[in-house]
């Protein structure tokens, strides 16, 4: 329990006097190493030098006039008389503590007291002048004629106030004695000091009562008002779904059946069979099962069955059915399909298309080489990444064409089918599963800040342009096998970083073609981002043959316009990946190789006119680029 403070550099000096004389003359500057000195700032500020003494022709000596119960370090050198300084051996040292001195811990002077208001007094006493090591605390024993009480006062508290205050004393006569406690033990008790605590007058008691009574009445009334308000809120919440009012024919008998009207999507409960749990959804458990007659020309179909928790409020049950009603409007191969609803009876069920490989986030993480459950699947190639991106963009293009803004596009909300097709998942299903991906800003609802665009973070505006930004983050998740975006930043730091124009870094081993597509989606100006149809147009040549047969992009419902032919000289043309449009006014994508084809880029067939560097916008960092960087050419969008 000792600490050694290294001595400063010094020159050896000869001290011809005997050790006793040296120590007595400088006794207060001796090296002292108390076990508790590290807790006292004043002790740490004092530096104790070493003192030297020569002992001739002896193997023992006595050092006197040392401080009591104090730890010393003693160094011994063996020296040759003729060699003087150069003939000394290396030092051998020992630590030794002196014996405690009797009476050193006694408080030397008288104890005094001062009256203080509110039935309290202040005791003062002097410190022991040369205690045994270090004073640790003081103990006060005080009391009236009935019984004694004890109060402990630390050394730090004593040095701060110069004494101690005794509070909450009853009126009457008291005696008090004080004892110091050092490293070696307890000192003697002081002589008793007598003091008197006066009783409050009747007038003072009346004043205190007049002040306390109105305050107590106000607190009681305020508490009752708060209790009634909370009780009223809870009663309305349990009856009407967290305070949201819904029109009903008979409010006294309000249920989900009064709000949701069965239609052609209604499925008889006896046609549904549950087999096993798939996981927890935002409203309740999701099961795998079999449904009869929900798909044309299929007697039985494997389906996913969503349920509502038994403890769910009426509001949650209605939101559950409303989500199913939204899904009724969608009929796209790259959007998870609704197959039916069971609204009659309990629990309410929603029948969805079964996506056997789960959500895209979990699927991507299962492809990591270090995963134990990796079924010997290699990480996705560039062509597979582009295939995933095209399928997600096709589903989002369909939603955009139907005037639907997703607002929560992320890998966790995309689902993977048995044949590895990626589809836009049923909306809101994964909110509880990946709770850490969301952030509650300013007491509002949970927000997926790491996937949100700058305008959504600033103004709460969600459009198809903000969905395109989120699509770029999904591409980043695909390239990193579902790493968390903006690793190392808290949600609050991500808010500031994105709103100030910050972007995700290029993932390791990410193909240039995929990263350039991400940068297109991360233009700071929303109108400068490509549409989902433009994104599909830029990657359509890389898609598998089956994409043309099932996609919304090639369907009659979309009917994309024929691209205009460009009458340009071949020497003025170059192949640039992911060109967002076929207009002659298009600008090329940012390319770190000065206009050369990006690595792993698409084949020939996508041609644009290259703009010179001087023609590019000088303030590109305001539209998604970074400061102190080569100006970022901005792709032209048909939405401008």
Swiss-Prot record:
Modified residues (Phosphoserine): 551, 555
Post-translational modification: Autophosphorylated on tyrosine residues in response to ligand binding. Autophosphorylation occurs in trans, i.e. one subunit of the dimeric receptor phosphorylates tyrosine residues on the other subunit. Autophosphorylation occurs in a sequential manner; Tyr-438 is predominantly phosphorylated first, followed by phosphorylation of Tyr-434 and Tyr-439. While every single phosphorylation increases kinase activity, all three tyrosine residues in the kinase activation loop (Tyr-438, Tyr-434 and Tyr-439) have to be phosphorylated for optimal activity. Polyubiquitinated at Lys-441 and Lys-444 through both 'Lys-48' and 'Lys-29' linkages, promoting receptor endocytosis and subsequent degradation by the proteasome. Ubiquitination is facilitated by pre-existing phosphorylation.
Domain Protein kinase: 272-547
Location in the cell: Cell membrane
Enzyme class: transferase
Membrane-spanning parts: 209-232
Segments on the Extracellular side according to the record's topology features: 14-208
Coiled coil: none
Key words of the record: ATP-binding, Cell membrane, Cleavage on pair of basic residues, Disulfide bond, Glycoprotein, Isopeptide bond, Kinase, Membrane, Nucleotide-binding, Phosphoprotein, Receptor, Repeat, Transferase, Transmembrane, Transmembrane helix, Tyrosine-protein kinase, Ubl conjugation
Sequence ranges assigned to domain Fibronectin type-III in this UniProt record: 5-101, 107-200
GO terms of biological process kind: cellular response to glucose stimulus; insulin receptor signaling pathway; insulin-like growth factor receptor signaling pathway; negative regulation of apoptotic process; negative regulation of MAPK cascade; positive regulation of MAPK cascade; positive regulation of phosphatidylinositol 3-kinase/protein kinase B signal transduction; protein autophosphorylation
Cytoplasmic side: 233-640
Cellular component per GO, a single term: cytoplasm
Ranges of biased composition (kind: Acidic residues): 563-572
Motif IRS1- and SHC1-binding location, chain numbering: 250-253
Enzyme Commission identifier(s): 2.7.10.1
Family, as annotated: Belongs to the protein kinase superfamily. Tyr protein kinase family. Insulin receptor subfamily.
Subunit note: Tetramer of 2 alpha and 2 beta chains linked by disulfide bonds. The alpha chains contribute to the formation of the ligand-binding domain, while the beta chain carries the kinase domain. Interacts with PIK3R1 and with the PTB/PID domains of IRS1 and SHC1 in vitro when autophosphorylated on tyrosine residues. Forms a hybrid receptor with INSR, the hybrid is a tetramer consisting of 1 alpha chain and 1 beta chain of INSR and 1 alpha chain and 1 beta chain of IGF1R. Interacts with ARRB1 and ARRB2. Interacts with GRB10. Interacts with RACK1. Interacts with SOCS1, SOCS2 and SOCS3.
Record PANTHER family: INSULIN-LIKE GROWTH FACTOR 1 RECEPTOR (PTHR24416:SF106), TYROSINE-PROTEIN KINASE RECEPTOR (PTHR24416)
Name of the featured protein: Insulin-like growth factor 1 receptor
Species assigned in the record: Bos taurus (Bovine)
């Amino acid at each position: 329990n000792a600490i050694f403070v290294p001595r400063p550099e010094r020159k050896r000096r000869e001290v011809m006097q005997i050790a006793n004389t040296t120590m007595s003359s400088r006794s207060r500057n001796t090296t002292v190493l108390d076990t508790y000195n590290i807790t006292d700032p004043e002790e740490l500020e004092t530096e104790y030098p070493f003192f030297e003494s020569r002992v001739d022709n002896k193997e023992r000596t006595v050092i006197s006039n040392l401080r009591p119960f104090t730890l010393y370090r003693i160094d011994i050198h063996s020296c040759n008389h003729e060699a003087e300084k150069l003939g000394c051996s290396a030092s051998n040292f020992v630590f030794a503590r002196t014996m405690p001195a009797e009476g050193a811990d006694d408080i030397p002077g008288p104890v005094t007291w001062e009256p203080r208001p509110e039935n309290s007094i202040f005791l003062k006493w002097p410190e022991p002048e040369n205690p045994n090591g270090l004073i640790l605390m003081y103990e006060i024993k005080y009391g009236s004629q009935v019984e004694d009480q004890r109060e402990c006062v630390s050394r730090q508290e004593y040095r701060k106030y110069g004494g101690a205050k005794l509070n909450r004393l009853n009126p009457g006569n008291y005696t008090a004695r004080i004892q110091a406690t050092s490293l070696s033990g307890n000192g003697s008790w002081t002589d008793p000091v007598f003091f008197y605590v006066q009783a409050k007058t009747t007038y003072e008691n009346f004043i205190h009562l007049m002040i306390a009574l109105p305050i107590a009445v106000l607190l009681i009334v305020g508490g009752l008002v708060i209790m009634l308000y909370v009780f009223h809120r809870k009663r309305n919440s349990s009856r009407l779904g967290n305070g949201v009012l819904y029109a009903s024919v008979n409010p006294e008998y309000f249920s989900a059946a009064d709000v949701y009207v069965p239609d052609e999507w209604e499925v008889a409960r006896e046609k549904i069979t549950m087999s096993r749990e798939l996981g927890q959804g935002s409203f309740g458990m999701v099961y795998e099962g079999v449904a009869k007659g929900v798909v044309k020309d299929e007697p039985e179909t494997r389906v996913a069955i969503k349920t509502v928790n038994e403890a769910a409020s009426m509001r949650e049950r209605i939101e559950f059915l409303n989500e199913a009603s939204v899904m009724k409007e969608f009929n796209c191969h790259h959007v998870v399909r609704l197959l039916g609803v069971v609204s009659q009876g309990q629990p309410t069920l929603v029948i969805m298309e079964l996506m056997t490989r789960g959500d895209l986030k979990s699927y991507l993480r299962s492809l990591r080489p270090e995963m134990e459950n990796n079924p010997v699947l290699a990480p996705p190639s560039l062509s597979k990444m582009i295939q995933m991106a095209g399928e997600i963009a096709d589903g989002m293009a369909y939603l955009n064409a139907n005037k639907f803004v997703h607002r929560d596009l992320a890998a966790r909300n995309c689902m993977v089918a048995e044949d590895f097709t990626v589809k836009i998942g049923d909306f809101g299903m994964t909110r509880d599963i990946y709770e850490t991906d969301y952030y509650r800003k300013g007491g509002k609802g949970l927000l997926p800040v790491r996937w949100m665009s700058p305008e959504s973070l600033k103004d709460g505006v969600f459009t198809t342009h903000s969905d395109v930004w989120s699509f770029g983050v999904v591409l980043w998740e695909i390239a990193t096998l579902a790493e968390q975006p903006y690793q190392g930043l808290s949600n609050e730091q991500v808010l500031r970083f994105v709103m100030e124009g910050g972007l995700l870094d290029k993932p390791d081993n990410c193909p240039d073609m995929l990263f350039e597509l991400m940068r297109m989606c991360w233009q700071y100006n929303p109108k400068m981002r490509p549409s989902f149809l433009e994104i599909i147009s830029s990657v359509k040549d890389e898609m598998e043959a089956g994409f043309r047969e099932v996609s919304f992009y090639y369907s009659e419902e979309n009917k994309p316009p024929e691209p205009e032919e460009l009458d340009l000289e071949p020497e003025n043309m170059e192949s640039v990946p992911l060109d967002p449009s076929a207009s002659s006014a298009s600008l090329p994508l940012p390319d770190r190789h000065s206009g050369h084809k990006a690595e792993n880029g698409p084949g020939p067939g996508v041609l644009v006119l290259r703009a010179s560097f001087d023609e590019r916008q000088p303030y590109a960092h305001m539209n998604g680029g970074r400061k102190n960087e080569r100006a970022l050419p901005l792709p032209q969008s048909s939405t401008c």
